Curated annotation (Swiss-Prot):
It is found in: Secreted. Expressed by the venom gland. GO terms for biological process: defense response. This is Alpha-like toxin Lqh6.
Amino acid sequence: VRDGYIAQPENCVYHCIPDCDTLCKDNGGTGGHCGFKLGHGIACWCNALPDNVGIIVDGVKCHK
């Protein structure tokens, strides 16, 4: 279990629309909020995500 910016499979962030709390909870986390991730912009930060849910890997660009 860890905290982090939840990632799409291409190492792209989920933007904060409509909100992050539901997205994080639907993926097994305890909740979430909007944050700013340098190089990605406004993104969803999740608390206590399971290890099998991807989080943003620093230094790897979004390749969508």
